Structure formats: C-alpha cells, structure tokens
C-alpha cells in the first residue's frame, strides 16, 4: 500500500490527493489561458476566474458529498471539513464551477459559450489527473475481482483493499477523460462545422456517458433513496448536451473555427 502522504514537513502533511488536484488545476489553467486569445478572451480574466471559482468549487464538491452522506457526518461533525481524507464529489464541483462561470462571464462581458468551450477540455484533463488522488486514498473503487494481473504492480497492490482486489474504476474514468480531452483537441482544430457550444455539449455527453457506465461498477457510490445519484446526474448531462447541440444548430451559432483560421 502506498503512503497517501507525499511530503511530511514537521506537523504539515502534504497528501498525494491534494497534489493530484493542484497539478490538474495548474495544467487546466495553462491550457485555458493558451486557448483564450483565440476566442478574444483576456488570459488574466482566466486567472481572476480561477481565484474565485476554485475555492468555491472545492466547497461545492465537499458540500455535495456531505449532503448525500449526512447520516454519517451528522454524527461526526468534526470530519466535515477534513477534505484531505477525500470526499470531494466531482458533480458538486462542476455545478458550483458552472454557476460561478456564468456569473463571471456575464460581469466581464465574455460570451458564456466561448468561455465554456475553452474550459471544457481543461476541466476534463484536470478530472483525469484528479482521479489519481482517489487512487492514493484507496477510494472510488469497484467490486471485488479475482486478480488484476493486466495492471502494473503498483496499481494492483494499491487496489488490494480489505483482503480482495478491486476494480480500479478510478483508472477507467481517468483514461476515459484523457481520451475525451484528446478528441476535443482534435475536433476544435480540424472539425470546421463545429459550432459555438458544441465542445461544451461534447464534454457533457462524453463525461456523462462514461461516468454513468463506470459509476455502475463502483461500490462506494453516493446513494439517494436507493439510487446512485451520479448516474441520474449523468443522464441529465447527456440530455443537456444533446439539447445544446440541437439548439445551437437551429440558431446557426457561429462556427468555433473562424474564417480567418480556415
């Protein structure tokens, strides 16, 4: 089993979980700032947005997680803020981040679709890296399996939990997001019929479908009245993505690749 603590500086423990999240954030900010001028968005505005959105998204991710496990946290109030032990729900962070983005874009007079389109692939790569934080914390895993011989030893050993090997669902989702990120990079450079909002729609459909399937493999899902919350939200994301494509096509939204770039 790998030590979840990466660096110990006296009483200060820096965990791999936090490092994975921060690494994903830094890469996401870099990629978004690099694409921003293409959509006539000032890179400094991206930094301003992150300074506001990131702490609020972390808060939203934790609040979402606590709400759906309130039976436990109502009896363990001291653990509500112990995010270093894990317990950040991606959907809570996404919902909070999207709300902050909408308000921020409106106040900065930035087209919301453009902002979402340049942010979507960055969010996806950040999610891909962030899932490795679950790996170090031994969470977000699936059902028991006989063996994991097809995986590298360090992953196999870390997925030996409570006397059994577990499906590395964190890895499946990480790779799924990485593939989605690569496809978006290709689409936004090569697909000339790509309209404003289509990248956002692709993200919603791609991530929603992958999460819906992978969530069904997990054994630690957040439940609500006997249903997996993330699977229901995944269905909503897929439906929303399809609606965005239809809406943007009907209103003949501007193409993502401008005539100057053709």
From Swiss-Prot:
<feature type="binding site">
    <location>
        <position position="131"/>
    </location>
    <ligand>
        <name>a 1,2-diacyl-sn-glycero-3-phospho-(1'-sn-glycerol)</name>
    </ligand>
</feature>
<feature type="transmembrane region" description="Helical">
    <location>
        <begin position="197"/>
        <end position="217"/>
    </location>
</feature>
<keyword id="KW-1133">Transmembrane helix</keyword>
<feature type="transmembrane region" description="Helical">
    <location>
        <begin position="80"/>
        <end position="100"/>
    </location>
</feature>
<comment type="pathway">
    <text>Protein modification; lipoprotein biosynthesis (diacylglyceryl transfer).</text>
</comment>
<keyword id="KW-0472">Membrane</keyword>
<comment type="similarity">
    <text>Belongs to the Lgt family.</text>
</comment>
<dbReference type="Pfam" id="PF01790">
    <property type="entry name" value="LGT"/>
</dbReference>
<feature type="transmembrane region" description="Helical">
    <location>
        <begin position="226"/>
        <end position="246"/>
    </location>
</feature>
<comment type="function">
    <text>Catalyzes the transfer of the diacylglyceryl group from phosphatidylglycerol to the sulfhydryl group of the N-terminal cysteine of a prolipoprotein, the first step in the formation of mature lipoproteins.</text>
</comment>
<keyword id="KW-0808">Transferase</keyword>
<dbReference type="GO" id="GO:0042158">
    <property type="term" value="P:lipoprotein biosynthetic process"/>
</dbReference>
<dbReference type="InterPro" id="IPR001640">
    <property type="entry name" value="Lgt"/>
</dbReference>
<protein>
    <recommendedName>
        <fullName>Phosphatidylglycerol--prolipoprotein diacylglyceryl transferase</fullName>
        <ecNumber>2.5.1.145</ecNumber>
    </recommendedName>
</protein>
<dbReference type="GO" id="GO:0005886">
    <property type="term" value="C:plasma membrane"/>
</dbReference>
<keyword id="KW-0812">Transmembrane</keyword>
<feature type="transmembrane region" description="Helical">
    <location>
        <begin position="167"/>
        <end position="187"/>
    </location>
</feature>
<feature type="transmembrane region" description="Helical">
    <location>
        <begin position="41"/>
        <end position="61"/>
    </location>
</feature>
<dbReference type="GO" id="GO:0008961">
    <property type="term" value="F:phosphatidylglycerol-prolipoprotein diacylglyceryl transferase activity"/>
</dbReference>
<keyword id="KW-1003">Cell membrane</keyword>
<feature type="transmembrane region" description="Helical">
    <location>
        <begin position="109"/>
        <end position="129"/>
    </location>
</feature>
<feature type="transmembrane region" description="Helical">
    <location>
        <begin position="9"/>
        <end position="29"/>
    </location>
</feature>
């Amino acid at each position: 089993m790998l030590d979840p603590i990466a660096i110990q500086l006296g009483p200060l423990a820096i965990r791999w979980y936090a490092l994975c999240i921060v690494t994903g954030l830094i890469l996401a900010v870099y990629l978004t700032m690099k694409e921003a001028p293409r959509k006539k968005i000032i890179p400094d505005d991206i930094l301003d947005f992150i300074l506001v959105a990131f702490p609020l998204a972390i808060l939203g991710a934790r609040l979402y997680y606590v709400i759906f496990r309130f039976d436990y946290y109502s009896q363990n109030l001291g653990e509500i803020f112990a995010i270093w032990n894990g317990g950040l729900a991606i959907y809570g962070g996404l919902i909070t981040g999207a709300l902050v983005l909408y308000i921020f874009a409106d106040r900065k007079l930035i087209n919301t679709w453009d902002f979402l389109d340049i942010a979507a692939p960055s969010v996806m790569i950040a999610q891909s890296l962030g899932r490795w934080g679950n790996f170090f914390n031994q969470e977000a895993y699936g059902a028991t399996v006989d063996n994991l011989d097809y995986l590298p030893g360090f992953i196999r050993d870390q997925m030996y939990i409570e006397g059994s090997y577990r499906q590395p669902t964190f890895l499946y989702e990480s790779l799924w997001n990485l593939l989605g990120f690569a496809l978006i990079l290709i689409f936004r450079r090569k697909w000339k019929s790509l309209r404003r909002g289509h990248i956002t729609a692709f993200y919603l459909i791609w991530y929603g479908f992958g999460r819906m399937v992978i969530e069904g493999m997990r054994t630690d899902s957040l439940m609500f009245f006997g249903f997996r919350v993330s699977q229901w939200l995944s269905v909503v994301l897929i439906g929303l993505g399809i609606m965005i494509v239809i809406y943007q096509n009907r209103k003949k939204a501007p193409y993502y690749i401008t005539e100057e770039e053709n």
